[in-house]
Regions:
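A glycine-rich helix N-cap at a beta->alpha junction
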Residues: 52-81
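Histidine-anchored nucleotide/phosphate-binding helix
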Residues: 15-36
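Short, glycine-rich nucleotide/cofactor-binding loops
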Residues: 3-17, 46-51
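Hydrophobic anchor at the start of a short beta-strand
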Residues: 3, 33-34, 74
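N-terminal glycine-rich phosphate/adenylate-binding segment common to multiple enzyme folds
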Residues: 78-132
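Flexible, charged surface loops at secondary-structure boundaries
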Residues: 30, 68-69, 116-120
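Short connector loops at secondary-structure junctions
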Residues: 37-46
Length: 132
């Protein structure tokens, strides 16, 4: 079965960790993961400058490792990312910013990628959002 995930929550939330565990489990069961779309506060997953304590699980890094092992898309909503200071080199140039901080395992893109994930997946599972 082909899945896509929609993550609304920041890396520090239980909902985000549950999304990662779900992705890891479905891949272990030989299902396919088409795309993980990070929306609203989920955009914070894209920050490459986030520092996690030595005794904490680095969820953003873990997504990158899982993505490299299983070759699926990790997409940060561009509007949510820009609003939260997550920016790639292209957008840094566009907005005259001297730096960028998007993780190299992720991409910034619009809601069309979420619509595409809905069309190309058999299931879209959402994690986080209101009332986490």
């Amino acid at each position: 079965m082909i899945f896509s995930l929609l993550v609304h929550s920041p890396p520090s939330s239980q909902a985000s960790f549950s999304a990662y565990q779900f992705a890891d489990a479905l891949l272990a069961q030989n299902h396919s993961l088409y795309r993980v779309f990070f929306y609203h506060d989920g955009a914070y997953h894209g920050s490459d400058i986030q520092c996690v304590g030595q005794d904490e699980f680095d969820l953003s890094k873990a997504w990158g490792v899982l993505q490299r092992e299983h070759n699926f898309d990790l997409v940060i909503c561009i509007a949510a990312g820009l609003k939260r200071g997550i920016i790639d080199s292209k957008e840094a140039g566009r907005y005259a910013k001297s730096q960028h901080n998007l993780s190299n395992t992720m991409e910034l893109s619009g809601l069309g990628q979420l619509a595409d994930a809905t069309v190309n997946s058999e299931r879209l599972i959402s994690f986080g959002g209101r009332g986490e």
